[in-house]
Amino acid sequence: MGAGPVFCLGDIVGYGANPDEVVSWVKKRGVVCVLGNHDEAVLTGEVSWFNRHAAQAALWTRRVLSQESRAFLGALPATRIAEVEGLKILMAHGSPSDPLREYVDPSTHSDLFEFYLTKHKVDAVALGHTHVPYVWASKVGAVFNPGSVGQPRTGDPRASFATAEISGHQLSVDLHLTPYDIDTAAEKMQQAGLPPILWQRLYRGI
């Protein structure tokens, strides 16, 4: 599938066993990123509001992450507006108003979605954090979450991502699922000594 710019909505690191490799992959391909709450926790070491498994993984990542990767993550903005073919897309991990903490799920009232679009004068808002994919669209614009390429929360273990097509100054978003090598990811997490629940849940998509 042909593609233009690639966006990542945060949490580049924090759960998996290959954080430096992931950062290197993102940098090499020029992926446009924003900071996620797990990225921030790895940078600061502040994990008091994480559950113990997520906290352990974040602190492990903090110990093994290279200075080069830290510098890359530390330079990421909490929000950014990307312009693609004349359309403006606001990117945030959580929400536009609380980029690192707030969860915006599919049941969010449409008035709030429209508020995001009109307040920031954008054509679309792309969010992460929940690991649950959805697309909301109206005449005002679109708000979408591509889901997660790791640690899904939908009961489906496949990696989730979104593609957007622009035609006639209109944005249409499609969600996709694709299988990946869970066995290898889980094995590497076990070898790293990460909490078992974090690799076991990969098989269940929860």
Language model region names:
Residues W49-Q56, E85-H120, P152:
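Active-site-proximal segments of metal-dependent phosphoesterases and phosphodiesterases across multiple
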Residues A124, W136-I206:
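Acidic, His/Gly-rich catalytic cores of divalent-metal-dependent hydrolytic chemistry
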Residues G14-G16, H38-L43, S97-D98, A124-A137, ...:
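Active-site environment of divalent metal-dependent phosphoester hydrolases
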Residues A78-G86, W136-S138:
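Short acidic-hydrophobic surface loop/beta-edge motif
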Residues V6-D11, V32-N37, A92, A124-H129, ...:
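Active-site neighborhood of phospho(di)ester-bond hydrolases with catalytic His/Asp-centered motifs
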Residues M1-A3, V84-E85, T118-K121, S167-G168:
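Glycine-rich phosphate-binding loop signature in dinucleotide/nucleotide-binding domains
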Residues M1-G74:
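Core catalytic region of metal-dependent phosphoesterases/phosphodiesterases
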Residues P106-P146:
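Anionic-ligand binding region
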